[in-house]
Amino acid sequence: MLSKSKRILFGMLHGIMLLVMVHWFLISVTYLREISWLAILGAGLLFLLAWLKRDGVKRAIAWLSQHKKGFLLGAIVFQVIVMVCAELFIRRDAAVVFKGAFELLKQSSITNYLSRNPNNIPLFLYEKFFYVLFGSNGLWVMQVLNMLYVNLGAVLLYKLSQKHFNQKTADLVFLFYVSLICYSPYFYSMYTDIPPLPLIALQLWWALDLLKENQAEVSWKKIVGLGILSGVTMVIRPTTIIVMIAFWAVLFFRGNWKAFGKVATVTVMTTGFVFAGLNTAVNHQTVVPILKKDGLAKGPLLFINLGLTDMGHNQEDMKEGLLAYIDEDKRSDYNNGLFKKENVMKEIKRRLKEYGPLGLIGHIYYKQSLTVAEGTLGWLYRDVEYEKTPYINPLYAPLTKNNGLAKWVRTYFLSTDRPQYKYYEFVKQLIWIVLSAGLLGAYLKRRDTDAFNFLSLAVFGGLLFLTIFEGGKTRYLIQFLPQILLVASIGLAGFTKKENT
């Protein structure tokens, strides 16, 4: 009975993911129109040339695979260059949190912001820690750590793939990761997308270890370690619980109840205890005063409502809808109860009724299209004059403002307002199209293995989360990129001897 249920459920998952990946591939190709009509022509010619000269392409990939250290070293050089040359360093919410942590805002301002956005308190405390230790130099300590986080993720995913899949998969996942994330300025933006990347890679590694081991001889150290790691990672990025849910689901369908009870109980308890302990510490911190009033803080329901806005992340539309439930004379008050649960629930119901079944399907399709579209992973650093709360690079005025090389870097790699940025965007989109082809290839045939089912569930869970909650930005995929890259690499490389059935 359980075996039959497993075949049916994972068969349904396979069918859903195949449709999702067909859509992903088509969107990644058609997004070329947003870059330029010449981009479509150029991409078509390049892919045709690559097919005609596929032996040469294979040799080029093999050469890159043999020179991984050099490829990663080049990425580190790139990171240093863009970090030094950037003008706009941190933007939007990340800039508010940083300025508050480094005492560049009034305490009342950061208190008001964090009271409204308590999900950013862990990031504030993290940045405050480095400010207390290093003063203003704490910024550069964190940037070096960001470089460590992003590059360590490449190494861990490579080693994971070597152990659990095959060398070809390992080579591809390394090249994808370094090309998309390491050769990117995202690391210095101070979003919480980057720090958990190596932790997610470890989470996937240890989960795959446990799925591979003889269930009668599972290591207690690995079970407890996975639970502790997951609890810590959840504080940074709560969505990492999706990896654990996928792990528990695959373990459940094995039907070995003794092993499932042992592993699930210990990992659930350790994950829960660690997360609850750290979360309690965050909620009772005394570094910055937090106001506790009904309807002041943004809760989980609000992000479901935000996900129902036209693009899936339209803050102005969300606020405008909620203001309809507030008396006109109170709409400008700081704490007018805007985010009360009853108001949010009314607004969610209104939006769902307004969409109707077909409208909701269309909304989900559009939102998913925005989520998977961009090879730059949604990089959106515009010229400074368009930013509300910019934090300018301390090196800009004294060092790089009038430097020719720095201007060239900002023009071609950092500012999306510049027409020259489209060359970089085009190259990234080509890589994204190949990635999406790998994702599609992974589901063109059924791969009924525990390892693949686990990764597939982890990807599906991430996409489902972005469908229900705030979404519509490719940047939101970064938190799920390790499992996405693994599935794409498996699709391009195929499984060989190390499949685990």
Located regions from the model:
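Loop-to-helix entry region of an early transmembrane alpha helix in multi-pass inner-membrane enzymes
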Residues: N117, I121, G135-L152, Y421-K428
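Membrane-interface anchor segments at the N-terminal boundary of transmembrane helices
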Residues: M21-A39, V141, V372-F460
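Membrane-interface alpha helices of multi-pass inner-membrane proteins
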Residues: K221-R237, T270-V274
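Membrane-proximal stem/loop segments at transmembrane-domain junctions that anchor or position
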Residues: V287-T400
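Extracytoplasmic catalytic/substrate-binding loops of multi-pass membrane glycan-assembly enzymes
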Residues: A86-F102, K106-W140, K340-K341, P357
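Transmembrane-helix motifs of polytopic, lipid-linked glycan transferases
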Residues: V144-H164, L202, A437-G441
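Short acidic/glycine- and proline-prone juxtamembrane loop motifs at membrane-interface regions
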Residues: C182, Y188-P196, I236
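Transmembrane-helix signature of polytopic, membrane-embedded enzymes
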Residues: L157-S179, P198, D450-F454
